[in-house]
């Protein structure tokens, strides 16, 4: 039987939900009105908290304990956001803007535009 998010992450689940809300609220504040061409730079935004099965699989591959506390301590992607943009330039502009926000810290980024995954 699969664990629920609450069972796996325990009390940290509610903190993860709050982090997810902060990220989404911040993204909604992106100054899109500054775009003279009128094209909305963010087509849509999707967020998630990594599901327990995926997190356990990731931790097993790393050879560490598979509990929720270890997951939060040892990984950087318990909470994730995907922003789909109208144009490639918008991706870099939004990424740069996010890095200037002071209500969270970006721990790691991966540039799959410049360096696509091999699959």
Spell out what each predicted region is.
Residues 1-75:
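Charge-rich, low-complexity segments
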Residues 63, 80, 117-119:
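Glycine-centered flexibility motif
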Residues 72, 85-119:
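Long beta-strand-rich cores associated with HINT superfamily self-processing modules
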């Amino acid at each position: 039987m699969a664990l629920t998010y609450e069972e796996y992450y325990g009390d940290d689940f509610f903190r993860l939900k709050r982090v997810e809300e902060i990220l989404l609220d911040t993204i909604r504040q992106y100054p899109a009105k500054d775009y003279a061409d009128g094209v909305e730079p963010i087509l849509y935004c999707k967020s998630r908290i990594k599901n327990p099965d995926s997190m356990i699989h990731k931790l097993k591959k790393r050879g560490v304990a598979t509990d929720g506390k270890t997951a939060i301590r040892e990984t950087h992607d318990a909470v994730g956001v995907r922003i789909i943009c109208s144009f490639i330039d918008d991706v870099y502009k939004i990424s740069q803007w996010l890095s200037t926000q002071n209500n969270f810290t970006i721990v790691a980024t991966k540039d799959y535009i410049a360096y696509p995954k091999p699959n």
